[in-house]
Design a protein with these regions (language model features):
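N-terminal lobe/hinge region of extracytoplasmic solute-binding protein
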Residues: 74-130, 254
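Gly/Pro-rich hinge or "lid" segments in bacterial periplasmic/extracellular proteins
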Residues: 107-113, 188, 208-209, 215-284, ...
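Surface-exposed binding/hinge segments that line
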Residues: 157, 162-165, 169-237
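Ligand-site clamp/hinge motif
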Residues: 242, 277-322
């Protein structure tokens, strides 16, 4: 999740991962058509969880397709919207990859588990100018919306500009700032009834089949950003017709991808059918698939065992025994480029407005005990926000088991004393009477258990009170977005593309994912410099310096865990996505040998 930006995923996904994620890898300026290998490649294997007995090193991709092609899978929550310009959670991202058509997609390289490549999608090809500033996308002939209207370059142009439009309040708008003139327009305060001035914005549909995008400066990973939802096509006529209800339901969501979302029952199920008008329909094998909304991990595992769903992430050792050496399943293990974290309310009127209070909370949490007690030892402790699976133009950034939070703990051996000092500075009174309100979005048993663990851990270590409030995703995000009524929000962020900026810019004061009140001019400056810097080594240092400010000096957030995906699939599943960065959705999966 953006995630963007908000890939704020339910913590139950530590135990049961839906694997419909949508994120991306980085390309090199000299070769805009070839992405860098992700950290799921061979060189990064040392940072993944140890391979389980029976885990595959190559995904099954071949086999005679069954006559009846269908898949049953699950997700843990319903999206707030299907609007590419309005949503930001992984639940919506996963749907949009299947019902809309990005200009470019990212797929696994067959026979090279962990490697990925760009493939033409809504654009049949694209060119990059010699100066690295102008991308020309040649929009494909023959793709149509579900009402028969042709998909044109103007739909992509409109979609991007709608995300830039400040009236839209697009949560991913900062990822358009690489485009010439986009940031200025997005930050313009418009008078009532005033339209944005796009005359200097570098997004132009030259004709129905040619889209030209001009950047402020060369961006090594720009094609990765093009695969995200803010570059998906949108229908201006339907936005104007439906207004606030645009893409809030299957009926008001225009679709042009490999599948059509036929119907859904909110918080129950989603039903998809193959789009017979899709340009690449011959390579789409599934005729339908169903996504059930299941929040409880035991219910998920029972559904997998009973054949009600065809794959799931399994972390519980008791359940692993049911699947690991069972010939009816195969498994894969992958380190995810994501981080669950405590996001602190830094506003002065919150109980976490003081940086020493935040620092104390960050180092008081026993991450490994949390992992062992609540998550069966599956994920890994996080001491940096940017996960080890994310690189800088192919260069290693963070190492597993190291990080600024660990350094902070080493330099402050008494978190209670630090907490009391911060409480005194903030004028909060008696430390024992201070109540820290922790909000979470996991209403499952795992969510309650992990919340209770954190509550006990912090109360014992700091001598304060901790109140835990778990809400379902919609209520949670609505409360968090007010910036009031909470001190800590337990969130998750998953990479939308393979670059530290995708994580760190969620805390930039001008592009913040949430209204936390956090602002540090030096932090912002370092990220601004990294945005235009072309040298990978210099970018690494800029990001490290920025992350130190964020986690060590200011403790604006506190990373908790990096997740491991241990996915079990039915033996008849073929061509499933392995890479976290794949954007193929369900379009290449099929079954062979289903009994």
């Amino acid at each position: 999740m953006k995630s963007k930006k908000f890939l704020a995923l339910l913590l139950v996904l530590v135990m049961a991962i839906s694997v419909l994620a949508s994120c991306k890898p980085a390309d090199k300026p000299a070769d805009a058509d070839k992405p860098a290998e992700t950290t799921e490649g061979k060189e990064e294997g040392k940072e993944e969880a140890p391979a389980e007995t029976g885990a595959l090193t190559e995904m099954p991709t071949d086999g005679e397709p069954d006559a009846d092609q269908y898949i049953n899978t699950f997700d843990t929550a319903h999206p707030n919207t299907l609007d590419p310009a309005k949503g930001s959670d992984s639940y919506g991202n996963g749907i949009l990859l299947n019902i809309l058509e990005p200009l470019v997609r990212i797929q696994d390289v067959k026979g090279q588990m962990g490697s990925v490549e760009y493939v033409p999608a809504g654009a049949e090809s694209w060119d990059l100018s010699e100066d690295g500033l102008t991308y020309t996308f040649h929009v494909r002939e023959g793709n149509v919306w579900n009402d028969g209207t042709p998909v044109t370059a103007k739909d992509y142009e409109y979609g991007i500009k709608r995300c830039i439009d400040p009236r839209t309040a697009c949560p991913y708008a900062n990822n358009t700032y690489y485009i010439k003139g986009a940031e200025k327009v997005n930050k313009t305060k418009l008078a009532e009834g005033q339209e944005p001035d796009y005359s200097e914005v570098g997004v132009v549909a030259k004709d129905d089949k040619t889209l030209e995008i001009t950047l402020e400066h060369p961006v090594p990973f720009f094609i990765d950003i093009v695969t995200t939802r803010i570059f998906f096509p949108q229908r201006q006529d339907l936005v104007e017709q439906y207004q606030d209800t645009y893409s809030t339901s299957p009926e008001t969501a225009p679709q042009c991808g490999p599948f059509i979302l036929k119907d859904w029952v909110i918080n129950s199920e989603q039903n998809y059918v193959k789009n017979d008008n899709y340009w690449d329909k011959d390579n789409v094998k599934l005729s339908k698939y169903k996504v059930s909304i299941i929040k409880d991990s035991n219910t998920i595992f029972n559904a997998l065992k009973a054949g009600q769903i065809d794959y799931a992430g399994v972390g519980d050792p008791k359940w692993k025994g049911e699947f690991l050496n069972n010939p009816d399943y195969y498994s894969t293990v992958r380190a995810n480029p994501d981080t669950t974290y405590f996001m602190f309310n830094c506003n002065a009127d919150s109980n976490t407005g003081n940086n020493k209070v935040r620092q104390a909370i960050s180092i008081a949490l026993d991450r490994q005990e949390l992992i062992d007690s609540c998550y069966n030892g599956v994920p890994t402790a996080a001491f940096d926000f940017v996960p080890p699976a994310v690189t800088v133009q192919g260069k290693e950034f963070n190492k597993l088991g190291e990080g600024w939070v660990k350094k902070l703990a080493e330099d402050n051996p008494d978190p209670k004393a630090l907490f009391e000092e911060g409480v005194k500075e903030a004028g909060l009174g008696d430390p024992a009477s201070v109540t820290i309100k922790l909000m979470g979005s996991d209403t499952s048993q795992e969510g309650r258990t992990s919340g209770e663990f954190v509550q006990q851990c912090l109360e014992e270590a700091l001598g304060c009170k901790v109140e835990v409030d778990n809400q379902d995703w919609s209520q949670f995000i609505n409360i968090v977005q007010t910036g009031k009524g909470w001190d800590i929000a337990w969130l998750a962020w998953g990479a939308d593309f393979n670059d530290p900026s995708n994580f760190l810019e969620t805390c930039h004061s001008q592009t913040a994912a949430y209204p936390t009140g956090y602002k540090n001019e030096e932090f912002d400056k370092l990220l601004d410099e990294a945005k235009v810097e072309q040298d990978a080594d210099k970018r690494v240092q800029l990001f490290h310096d920025a992350e130190k400010i964020l986690l060590y000096d200011d403790a604006a957030l506190s990373p908790v865990i990096h997740r491991i995906a241990n996915v079990f699939r039915r033996s008849y599943i073929r061509n499933a996505n392995y890479s976290f960065f794949s954007t193929m959705g369900m379009s290449r999966i099929f079954t062979s040998g289903r009994k």
